[in-house]
A protein has these predicted regions:
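Conserved ABC ATPase signature
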Residues: 5-9
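Conserved signature/switch motifs of ABC ATPase nucleotide-binding domains
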Residues: 25, 57
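Catalytic Walker B motif of ABC-type/P-loop ATPase nucleotide-binding domains
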Residues: 30-33
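H-loop/switch region of ABC-family ATPase nucleotide-binding domains
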Residues: 65-66
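A short, surface-exposed alpha-helical micro-motif characterized by mixed small hydrophobic
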Residues: 71-73
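C-terminal boundary and immediately downstream tail of ABC-type ATPase nucleotide-binding domains
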Residues: 98-135
Length: 136
């Protein structure tokens, strides 16, 4: 790996190299943008456990993902973006239970789309209508 250019690495290998770099440096903030695609399941689980350990050790970890289940399982706090803006910020635990702490209609739609919450799927028009009514 040491003699290879980044474009010569597979997606999973490149992510493993980046995780290794994060561990051996003294960075106070680690930004992980979609860290698990391209990794096999075992490597992805290990990478997420590593991020959790780094956060527990006092490092700042910003996990950027489209996988709401992953965010809820790994993060302490989940920020939800809609149309390029942060519309909600809640403890990850708020996505379990009844979702009463969730404020924005888009966040509530995401909550209801989770399999453990009856997997209610809304059309784009319904989400747009809900956010317009709820004040985006």
């Amino acid at each position: 790996v040491q003699r290879l250019y980044p474009f010569q690495l597979s997606g999973g290998m490149a992510r493993r190299v980046l995780f290794s770099t994060a561990v051996i440096t003294d960075a106070s903030l680690i930004i992980a943008d979609e860290p698990t695609p391209g990794m096999d399941v075992k490597s992805a689980v290990e990478a997420l456990q590593l991020l959790r350990e780094l956060a527990d050790a006092g490092k700042g970890v910003l996990l950027i993902t489209h996988d709401i289940d992953l965010a809820v399982e790994v993060a302490d706090t989940v920020a939800v973006f809609y149309e390029g803006r942060t519309v909600d910020m809640a403890p990850a635990a708020a996505f379990h239970g009844d979702g009463a702490e969730l404020v924005h209609p888009y966040t509530k739609a995401l909550y209801h789309a989770l399999p453990q919450n009856d997997f209610t799927v809304y059309t784009a028009a319904e989400v747009t209508q809900m956010t317009a009514a709820g004040g985006a």
